[in-house]
């Protein structure tokens, strides 16, 4: 089963010694019926798919995950942030780690406000890109599908990952970094939104919301 085909929690990709799991795996070598370990459990993906690659050379990593951590979204920035640092330590270098910020999912809402863990996961990914060495992020909120948590059309997401890598890693003139809002002011009956770089917007301007400093 390939790494792309699973949606385990991020902690499954962390490195950690788990004696209970190790004992069960050792027994399973001689008794196939004893193999009851959940393949996506804590540290299983690391030991099964990542640890064997330590020592090999590569340019960087692409990370598309987060849906399964929505139930513990507030802790995600620490879980994924620590995992990235652990991977860097394992290879002895701070290689590029490009995160796919979760795209949209489910039907459009009458107001541009989304509750639940997904928005927090997206904010955590942005925080990690700002604070963890080597971490970067591609924005995909305008992509995704209403009824499929795994969008079938992966090409646009791949193109954006490539653009981030070309701009941030290979230092080309590609544009991979999405613009960010730096200020929003109410002037009369209109909102004036300022971005950190020139943008070309298309649309009716109705699909956005403003959060106050108190979180409301």
Language model segments and positions:
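Cell-envelope and extracellular/periplasmic
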Residues: 1-216
């Amino acid at each position: 089963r390939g790494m792309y085909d699973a949606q385990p929690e991020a902690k499954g990709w962390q490195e950690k010694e788990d004696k209970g799991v190790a004992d069960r795996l050792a027994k399973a070598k001689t008794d196939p019926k004893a193999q009851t370990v959940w393949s996506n459990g804590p540290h299983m993906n690391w030991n099964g798919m990542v640890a064997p690659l330590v020592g090999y050379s590569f340019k960087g990593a692409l990370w598309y995950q987060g849906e399964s951590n929505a139930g513990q979204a507030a802790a995600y920035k620490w879980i994924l942030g620590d995992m990235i640092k652990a991977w860097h330590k394992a290879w002895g270098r701070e290689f590029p780690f490009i995160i796919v910020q979760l795209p949209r999912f489910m039907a459009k809402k009458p107001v541009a406000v989304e509750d639940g863990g997904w928005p927090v996961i997206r904010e955590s990914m942005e925080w990690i890109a700002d604070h963890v060495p080597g971490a970067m992020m591609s924005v995909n909120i305008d992509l995704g599908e209403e009824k499929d948590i795994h969008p079938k059309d992966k090409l646009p997401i791949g193109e954006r990952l490539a653009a981030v890598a070309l701009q941030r890693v290979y230092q080309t003139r590609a544009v991979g970094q999405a613009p960010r809002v730096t200020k929003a002011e109410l002037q009369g009956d209109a909102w004036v939104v300022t971005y950190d770089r020139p943008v070309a917007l298309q649309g009716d301007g109705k699909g956005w919301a403003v959060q106050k400093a108190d979180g409301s």
